[in-house]
Amino acid sequence: MGCFGCSKKSSKRSETNKDTVINRKIVGGTTSVAKSDKRDDQTQPSSDSTKVSPYRDVNNEGGVGKEDQLSLDVKGLNLNDQVTGKKAQTFTFQELAEATGNFRSDCFLGEGGFGKVFKGTIEKLDQVVAIKQLDRNGVQGIREFVVEVLTLSLADHPNLVKLIGFCAEGDQRLLVYEYMPQGSLEDHLHVLPSGKKPLDWNTRMKIAAGAARGLEYLHDRMTPPVIYRDLKCSNILLGEDYQPKLSDFGLAKVGPSGDKTHVSTRVMGTYGYCAPDYAMTGQLTFKSDIYSFGVVLLELITGRKAIDNTKTRKDQNLVGWARPLFKDRRNFPKMVDPLLQGQYPVRGLYQALAISAMCVQEQPTMRPVVSDVVLALNFLASSKYDPNSPSSSSGKNPSFHRDRDDEEKRPHLVKETECEGSS
């Protein structure tokens, strides 16, 4: 979705925008929406459950014009009916144009695969919002729009961005979200303005734990469970007090059910975050998201990008750079973001790096389940580091604020990482 919290137009997203999809094909053709007099009223937040066709070409013999076909897509999906009674509202295009001053350039926040994002104010709600407008020539389209609306209309969690409403009018497709004043995690890690204070260790662990809880909700709490498939720094938005929320659910898929272990699908996602097993086989699992989360956790710890083309070839891929260093704890201090200036707890660093190493294991069966990741990161986030304490430094005795009893309460994954310290 890009940055919700920026206040001026910027070209800083050009690199991120280019890597929205892997091996993605823009499908054309004349397939129309499958319609039936009797529809299953059960809404599922996945492209599996929404049979949406690409646009029909207006020049096709007997075809339907693009504007008409887009309207038919929504009607055939009963989109408005499916979100009735949910928290999402429907808006007219005129309402959203007025909210953004007719999409003025000074309201522009950012741009992603879906389209441009604008800041606006919905007068009748007296609420500042972020409005994402579908680029009809972009890499994402009606399918992703529908999946996003269905997913967020069904979801309700403090670590998922709130969908306020949508517009499906003529050929216009827009999504209206709560406004996230601190922008994206990417803004604070990789495009930090000169003079702006970098995220401290405690805030980084807070963001990691919150993002993990959002992922846990998708995997373990939603019915049916959902595979996110697009977890990355630019999709983690930050609210007041840096409360993290996952955003951009257009690529989400319903997870495997019963005795199935995976969902076979086209490979889509972002290079650098995509699990190698999924990229090679097209077999999507919940562990695919765990890999992506491990990359994000590495970014939080190191301050490096998932893919950085300014580095030497062998160091461009963050996971490829980190794997040899995971093998020896003595390398761990070399991996820390220099912007932290040594202000981090050594034990907390070891544990966080070991968790990320487990998440980015080559073999998906070796990666932890999300509930274990949440337990471990909740523990690290609650173990506050005080840089002003006499015993606080990146030396031998890092200072944690916690009860003595916490030693017995440490989750299994944290204890395991202390023993191993590497993958």
From Swiss-Prot:
GO BP of this protein: defense response
Sequence positions bearing Phosphoserine: 234, 264
Gene name for this UniProt entry: PBL5
Organism in which the protein naturally occurs: Arabidopsis thaliana (Mouse-ear cress)
Lipid attachment residues per UniProt (S-palmitoyl cysteine): 3
Keyword terms, alphabetized: ATP-binding, Cell membrane, Kinase, Lipoprotein, Membrane, Myristate, Nucleotide-binding, Palmitate, Phosphoprotein, Plant defense, Serine/threonine-protein kinase, Transferase
Cross-referenced SUPFAM superfamilies: Protein kinase-like (PK-like) (SSF56112)
Protein name: Probable serine/threonine-protein kinase PBL5
Membrane topology annotation: Lipid-anchor
Region (Disordered): 1-66, 383-423
Gene3D superfamilies in UniProt: Phosphorylase Kinase, domain 1, Transferase(Phosphotransferase) domain 1
Keyword GTP-binding among record annotations: no
Lineage of origin: Eukaryota, Viridiplantae, Streptophyta, Embryophyta, Tracheophyta
Binding site for ATP: 109-117, 132
Broadest EC class assigned to this enzyme: transferase
Reaction catalysed by this enzyme: L-seryl-[protein] + ATP = O-phospho-L-seryl-[protein] + ADP + H(+); L-threonyl-[protein] + ATP = O-phospho-L-threonyl-[protein] + ADP + H(+)
EC number assigned by the record: 2.7.11.1
Sites of Phosphotyrosine modification: 177, 278
Main function: May be involved in plant defense signaling.
